[in-house]
Regions:
Chain B
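C-terminal catalytic domains of large/alpha subunits in multi-subunit enzymes
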Residues: 2-22, 104-105, 245-252, 282-290, ...
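Short acidic, glycine/serine/threonine-rich loops at helix termini
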Residues: 142-145, 236-238, 264-270, 299-305, ...
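Flexible, low-hydrophobicity surface segments
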Residues: 1-174, 273, 588
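Helix-loop-helix junctions that connect adjacent transmembrane helices in secondary transporters/permeases
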Residues: 166-244, 398, 402-470, 490, ...
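Glycine-rich loop/linker segments at domain edges
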Residues: 53, 58-65, 175-214, 306-384, ...
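Catalytic phosphate/nucleotide-handling subdomain of diverse soluble enzymes
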Residues: 458-512
Length: 327, 750
C-alpha cells in the first residue's frame, strides 16, 4: 500500500497550502474517494480532509442582493431542507438534492463533492480495463463496448457521462462558483468548472492543482421564475440517472419570458441546451411546445450501440421537467 | 397429549378447511402407521397452542442489534487476513507462477498456490494463489507481486453465440426449425388457436450480503472453521477430503456456522476460498480470515443462469391446451451444466407435450442453484406464453388457468387470490386513450415439490431439558436466515407444552446431530419431525420422573400447558424439572421415513398476482401491489413463513425489473460486479405486498410441514411480466424489463 499523509486543516489557508503540494487530493465527505482509494484506483501521497472547515464552508444564506450563497461543504440534506430554498424558483435544486442516492449519503455528501464527482463509467473504474480516461490505455473502451449508461451527446473521444445531478439545476439557475487558489479568490460562471472540450485526457473539472471550491452562488431569480429537475432511472432507490433535465422558466402573463434548459447524464459534461431553451421563449406552455423543446434538446445526438433508448427517455424527461416547472 | 407411543394404525384427517370466503372443506381420511417410537401424527383437527401463531423470530433482536456473530465477525488474537489472486484471463493455461517475492513481502505469513503451472484457466476470477498476512494492505501488496503468466486462448462469454447455440433472428426469436415430430405437428394443426414465441432471461447473481469465506484455526491436527455456508456437514466432508495430505479425517474437522448472511443456493460448498483458508492457516500456524470481496462474490460464486426459451402451443375450441412444445437453452458457464429450466406441467395433462433443454458452455463462472433452480426462468417464459396464447384465443388469463390447471388446491387458490386481489375489476379497467401511465395486472402459478429427506435417520435433533426448566433444541445444520431456529423452538415448545421463552435453539455446529443442506426447501420438512421426536422422547423421560415422584403409573402421565402429572396430581413445569438433577434429560430425535400412505399432496402450490404502473414516456415500470397465496403444508411460525414469501416476492420484483449481470465480451469480465451497477430492488421500488399462508395438513409425517425457500420464488417475475403485457397490450419477452425494452415494445406495437 502506498502510504499517504492525512491533513486535517485548522482553517482554509492551511487547507489551501496543503492542497498546493504535489500528488494531493481533497476530500469532502469521502463518499467516493474512500472507495477509490481502497480499490487503489487513486493512490495520492496526501489527502486533505476539508470537513473540519464546515464552520466556514458549509451553510446556506441569502445575501443582500437576493442571491443565495451555498457553502461548498453544505450537505445535500441541508440543501434539500433549508428554509432559504423553499421557493418555486429554486425547486429544481431541492428536487435534485432530495433524490440523490440514499438518506445516509445525503446526510454526508457535500454540494461541491457532488458537482466534482468522478465518472461512474465501468471501464474507467476498474483497473482491469486499460482505458484512456482511466489513464491506463490508448482509447475509450465504452465506445465499442457495453455502453447502455454512456453518452449520447457532446462526446468527443470518451463517452463517459458526468454523474452530478446538482450541476444541471445550478447551471439552469445561472449559478457561479468561488474558488481559492494561492490566496486569491475567483468567482466564475459554473459552466467554466467543466472542460470546454471534455476529452478523455481531461479530468471532469477545470480546477487547477491546489484550487479549492469554497461556495456556489445562485443569483436572485426574477419574479415569475420557476424551476424543476427530473431524472430517469432504472430504479427509484439509490440509482444514477440515465438521463436528467433541469429547467428554469420565467413566466409572465401566461407566456415563457425566459428559459434555461440543461441536460444531465447524457454527456461528459452537464449540457446546457440554449437552442431548446430559446424555442420556449415568447410561447405559452403547451404539450406541443415541450415536445418541440425536447426534440431540440436532443438535436445532434449521437447514440451508441446500446443506448439509443436515452433519446426517447431523455425527451420524456425534458417534457416532464417543463411540465412541472410551468404547472 | 398422551405420551404413549402408538404402534398401530392411526386414522388422521388430511387436507384443509375452506379458505376464507369459500365453501367446502377439502378434508380426507387417511390411515397412517407411524414408526415405532415416533410421536403420534398431527393432523387437520389438531388444536395447537403455539404452532401457526405469530411468534417473533427468536434471533431477530440479536441480528438487528449486532449481537449475532456471523463468520465475517469472528476474530482471534493473532488472526491473519487473506486474499486470492484471480485470473484476469477468461480462458487459457497458466504458464508461470512465481510466489517467492510475495512470500518475502513484509507482513506476509503464508502463500499457497491454488493452481499449478500447466493447469487450465477457465474464467476471469479463477483462483490462482492465496496470501495471508497481518492485514489486507500487506496481503494486497503481496498479491500484486505474484508473477502469474498465461497462455491466453480465444474465449466467449455470450452463450447466444456459442457453437451449438440456436439461430436467432434480428428480433431475438429462435429462427431454427423445431425438431420433427409428427404427433406434435398434428396436434398443432388440430388446434383452433396457436402461438409461437421466444423468451429470454439474463443472469442473476445470488448477492448474499455476507460474502463467501470464513475463519480457520488449527490446533495440532484438529481444524475448526467458522464458515458462511448452507451445508455444514457437506463442507466438513469436503474440507476433510481436500486436506487429506494434512493427516486429518472428517472427525478432525469442526464447522461452525451459527449465523449466515444469506446463501440462496450459492453456499453448498466450502469452495476454493474455504480450502485456501485452511491451507493458509496451516502454513502460517495462525488463525486466518478470508472473506471474498463484492466483486469476487458476484463473479466467482455462481449465479442463476440466463436462458433462451421458446414455446409453441395451441388450444382447442373450448380453450383447453392441446399442444405444448418447449425448448430451452441455458447459459452454463465453463462447466456446461446447471443451466436447465423447469416449466409447469399441470396445465398440459391432456396435451401433446414435448420438452427439450440444452446447456451451452461459455468461459464464465458456472451457475449454482438459486431459490427454485430453473423455475423462475421457465415460469416466466411459460406463463407469459400462456397469457399471449389466451389473448389470441380471447380468453381471460384467469379463466384460461381455471380451464387448464389440474390441481384442486390451486383451483381454490386462483379463486381466493382473484377475490382478494380484485382481479376481475382490475383486469377490466382500461387505460385512458393517450394516458401517460398505463396500468395492468397479471398472474402466475407456482409449484415446488419437496417433503423432506425421508429415510435419512442420520438427520437428528438433540433435545435437552435442564433442571432449571430451560430446554435446548440443537441441530448441526445451518440456518442461512430463513427461520430454522424459530421453527425448532416452536415445535419443541408445542410438544412439551411450555412457554417458547424456555426453549433455546442452537444450530450450525457440526458437533450436534446432522441435518440437511439448506437446499430445495428440505430443512423444515426434514428437521421439524426430528425436533418433534426429540421433544417427544424428552417429554417421556420427564413424565417417568414425575410418575415416580407422584407414585402413579408413567403411562398415563401427561405433560401439557406447563403442567406435568396425572389427574389432579400436577406439578408445575419448573417443579417437575427440579426432579431432573444435575445432568439434563438428553435425547436425540430422529427423522423417520415418511408414512407409506399417500400424502394429501406431494408438492406445494401457490398463486401470485401483480399490478404494475408503467410510464409510457420513459418506459419505467413500477410494481404497485402484489398478492400471493402459498401452501407450505403445516404453517409453524406464521410471521416467519410470511416473511419467506414476501422476501421471495421482493427478489422476484428485482429479477423481473432490475438484476442482470453485464459482461464485457472482449475481456470476459463482469462490468457491474458491485452493488452500484448491479441493480437490486430497494425500498422505494417495492410494491404493497400481501400474502396468505395456506396451511394444509399433508399427513406425510408426524408434523406435515414443507419448506419455503423455493415455493414462493417461482411465480413473482412471471406475474409481473404478465402485468406488463396487460398494461402495454404488448409483451416484453426478455427479463429484466428495463425501460429500454418497454419503449421498444411500445414502439413495435405502434
Amino acid at each position: 500500500m502506498k502510504p499517504f499523509s492525512y491533513v486535517v486543516p485548522k482553517d482554509l489557508a492551511e487547507a489551501a497550502a496543503a492542497a498546493a503540494q504535489p500528488d494531493t487530493v481533497l476530500k469532502g465527505a469521502g463518499v467516493d474517494l474512500v472507495d477509490r482509494m481502497k480499490e487503489r484506483l487513486q493512490t495520492p501521497a496526501q489527502v486533505v480532509n476539508l470537513l473540519p472547515l464546515r464552520r466556514e464552508l458549509a451553510g446556506v444564506a441569502r445575501t443582500a442582493d437576493g442571491a443565495v450563497h451555498i457553502g461548498a461543504l453544505t450537505t445535500l440534506t441541508e440543501l434539500e431542507q433549508h428554509a432559504e430554498l423553499q421557493d418555486p424558483a429554486l425547486q429544481a435544486l431541492r428536487q435534485s438534492a432530495g433524490m440523490t442516492a440514499t438518506p445516509h449519503v445525503r446526510n454526508r455528501a457535500t454540494v461541491a463533492g457532488n458537482i466534482l464527482q468522478f465518472t461512474r463509467c465501468w471501464y474507467v473504474r476498474s483497473e482491469a480495463f486499460h482505458c484512456l480516461h482511466g489513464g491506463r490505455g490508448p482509447t475509450c473502451l465504452a465506445v465499442t463496448g457495453e455502453n447502455r449508461y454512456h453518452a449520447v451527446l457532446g462526446w468527443l473521444d470518451c463517452v463517459r457521462v458526468h454523474p452530478s445531478n446538482l450541476a444541471p439545476p445550478l447551471l439552469a439557475l445561472g449559478a457561479e462558483y468561488t474558488t481559492t487558489l494561492a490566496g486569491k479568490e475567483r468567482r466564475r460562471a459554473l459552466a467554466e468548472l467543466f472542460p470546454a472540450e471534455p476529452r478523455a485526457q481531461n479530468p471532469e473539472h477545470t480546477l487547477l492543482p491546489g484550487e479549492i471550491v469554497t461556495a456556489l452562488h445562485v443569483p436572485k431569480q426574477p419574479a415569475g421564475a420557476r424551476s424543476a429537475y427530473c431524472e430517469s432511472r432504472e430504479k427509484q432507490t439509490f440509482d444514477w440517472a440515465t438521463t436528467a433535465c433541469a429547467v428554469r422558466v420565467v413566466l409572465q402573463g401566461g407566456k415563457i419570458a425566459a428559459a434555461d434548459l440543461v441536460l444531465g447524464a447524457v454527456g461528459p459534461n452537464p449540457l446546457p441546451r440554449p437552442k431548446a431553451a430559446a424555442a420556449l421563449v415568447g410561447e405559452a406552455p403547451s404539450a406541443a411546445l415541450f415536445q418541440k423543446a425536447a426534440e431540440l434538446a436532443f438535436a445532434g445526438a449521437n447514440p451508441l450501440a446500446h443506448n439509443d433508448y436515452k433519446l426517447t427517455v431523455g425527451k420524456a424527461i425534458v417534457r416532464q421537467a417543463l411540465d412541472e416547472a410551468t404547472r | 397429549m398422551n405420551a404413549r407411543t402408538p404402534q398401530e394404525d392411526v386414522k388422521i384427517r388430511v387436507g384443509y378447511k375452506a379458505l376464507p370466503g369459500q365453501k367446502g372443506d377439502r378434508l380426507e381420511e387417511r390411515t397412517v402407521k407411524p414408526a415405532a417410537g415416533d410421536a403420534p401424527p398431527w393432523d387437520a383437527m389438531t388444536q395447537f397452542a403455539l404452532v401457526g401463531s405469530d411468534v417473533d423470530r427468536v434471533d431477530g433482536l440479536a441480528k438487528a442489534s449486532g449481537r449475532a456473530k456471523y463468520s465475517y465477525d469472528v476474530t482471534f488474537p493473532g488472526m491473519l487476513q487473506a486474499m486470492i489472486l484471480r485470473s484476469p484471463v477468461p480462458r487459457g493455461k497458466l504458464t508461470a507462477l512465481e510466489l517467492d517475492e510475495a512470500a518475502r513481502m513484509p507482513g506476509v505469513q503464508a502463500v499457497v498456490a491454488l493452481k499449478e503451472v500447466g493447469n487450465k484457466v477457465r474464467f476471469v476470477g479463477d483462483a490462482i494463489a492465496a496470501v495471508a498476512g497481518v492485514n489486507l494492505h500487506a496481503v494486497r501488496d503481496a498479491i500484486e507481486r505474484i508473477r502469474a503468466e498465461y497462455d491466453r486462448e480465444e474465449h466467449n462469454v455470450d452463450y447466444l453465440v456459442a457453437d451449438d447455440a440456436p439461430m436467432v433472428d434480428e428480433k431475438g426469436a429462435i429462427s431454427e426449425d423445431w425438431p420433427a415430430d409428427e404427433g406434435m405437428t398434428a396436434a398443432l394443426l388440430e388446434a383452433k388457436v396457436t402461438h409461437d414465441a421466444t423468451y429470454r432471461v439474463e443472469v442473476q447473481t445470488h448477492s448474499s450480503l455476507e460474502t463467501h469465506g470464513g475463519v480457520a484455526r488449527w490446533t495440532g491436527n484438529d481444524l475448526e472453521v467458522w464458515l458462511s455456508t448452507q451445508a455444514t456437514f457437506g463442507c466438513r466432508g469436503e474440507l476433510a477430503r481436500a486436506l487429506q495430505g494434512k493427516k486429518i479425517d472428517v472427525g478432525s474437522v469442526t464447522i461452525h456456522s451459527e449465523f449466515v448472511g444469506g446463501g440462496f443456493g450459492s453456499k453448498f460448498g466450502a469452495g476454493i476460498e474455504g480450502l485456501a483458508l485452511c491451507l493458509l492457516a496451516h502454513a502460517a500456524k495462525a488463525p486466518v480470515k478470508l472473506m471474498l470481496d463484492r466483486f469476487e462474490e458476484h463473479t466467482t460464486t455462481g449465479n442463476r443462469p440466463g436462458a433462451l426459451m421458446q414455446a409453441r402451443g395451441g388450444v382447442d375450441a373450448e380453450g383447453r391446451i392441446v399442444a405444448w412444445d418447449w425448448r430451452s437453452f441455458g447459459h452454463a458457464g465453463f462447466s456446461a451444466s446447471g443451466g436447465s429450466v423447469a416449466v409447469p406441467n399441470y396445465y398440459t395433462a391432456d396435451a401433446k407435450v414435448r420438452r427439450n433443454h440444452k446447456d451451452l458452455a461459455i468461459d464464465a463462472d458456472p451457475p449454482r442453484p438459486m431459490r427454485a433452480p430453473g423455475h423462475p426462468q421457465g415460469w416466466f417464459g411459460a406463463e407469459l406464453f400462456l397469457d399471449e396464447l389466451a389473448a389470441k384465443a380471447g380468453v381471460d388469463p384467469l379463466t384460461f388457468r381455471l380451464n387448464n390447471d389440474r390441481e384442486q388446491i390451486r383451483q381454490d387458490q386462483w379463486r381466493f387470490a382473484a377475490e382478494r386481489f380484485g382481479w376481475a375489476a382490475a383486469r377490466a379497467r382500461a387505460n385512458e386513450p393517450g394516458a401517460r401511465l398505463l396500468r395492468g395486472v397479471g398472474l402466475s402459478s407456482a409449484r415446488w415439490g419437496n417433503l423432506g429427506n425421508p429415510g435419512r435417520p442420520a438427520h437428528g435433533i438433540t433435545c435437552r431439558i435442564h433442571q432449571d426448566g430451560t430446554v435446548e433444541t440443537r441441530s448441526g445444520a445451518q440456518e442461512p436466515g430463513v427461520g430454522t431456529k424459530t421453527m425448532l423452538s416452536v415445535i419443541t415448545a408445542e410438544e412439551l407444552g411450555v412457554d417458547l421463552k424456555l426453549v433455546k435453539a442452537t444450530v450450525g455446529h457440526t458437533g450436534d446431530p446432522s441435518g440437511p443442506a439448506s437446499g430445495g426447501s428440505t430443512v423444515t420438512p426434514s428437521l421439524a419431525p426430528a425436533a418433534r421426536h426429540a421433544a417427544f422422547l424428552a417429554k417421556q423421560q420427564l413424565c417417568e420422573l414425575v410418575a415416580k415422584h407422584l407414585g402413579v403409573p408413567a403411562a398415563n402421565v401427561t405433560c401439557a400447558g406447563g403442567l406435568v402429572g396425572l389427574g389432579k396430581e400436577q406439578l408445575r413445569w419448573a417443579e417437575a424439572c427440579k426432579l431432573i438433577g444435575p445432568n439434563p434429560i438428553d435425547v436425540r430425535g430422529q427423522r423417520f421415513a415418511n408414512y407409506d400412505s399417500k400424502p394429501f399432496h406431494g408438492s406445494q402450490c401457490g398463486v401470485q398476482m401483480a399490478e404494475v404502473e408503467i410510464d409510457s414516456w420513459t418506459g419505467f415500470v413500477r410494481v404497485t401491489r402484489m398478492f400471493g397465496i402459498q401452501d407450505c403444508g403445516l404453517v409453524i411460525a406464521r410471521k416467519l413463513a410470511e416473511s419467506q414469501v414476501l422476501g421471495a416476492m421482493i427478489q422476484g420484483v428485482s429479477y423481473a425489473l432490475h438484476e442482470q449481470r453485464i459482461m464485457d465480451k472482449r475481456s470476459g469480465r463482469m462490468l457491474n460486479g458491485d452493488f452500484l451497477r448491479y441493480k437490486i430492488t430497494g425500498v422505494r421500488d417495492l410494491p404493497e405486498l400481501e400474502c396468505h399462508m395456506h396451511s394444509i395438513a399433508n399427513g406425510h409425517d408426524s408434523v406435515g410441514a414443507a419448506g419455503l425457500g423455493e415455493p414462493p420464488s417461482v411465480a413473482s417475475a412471471a406475474a409481473i411480466a404478465n402485468a406488463v403485457f396487460h398494461a402495454l397490450r404488448a409483451p416484453v419477452r426478455h427479463l429484466p424489463i428495463t425501460p429500454d425494452k418497454v419503449l421498444k415494445a411500445l414502439a413495435q406495437k405502434g
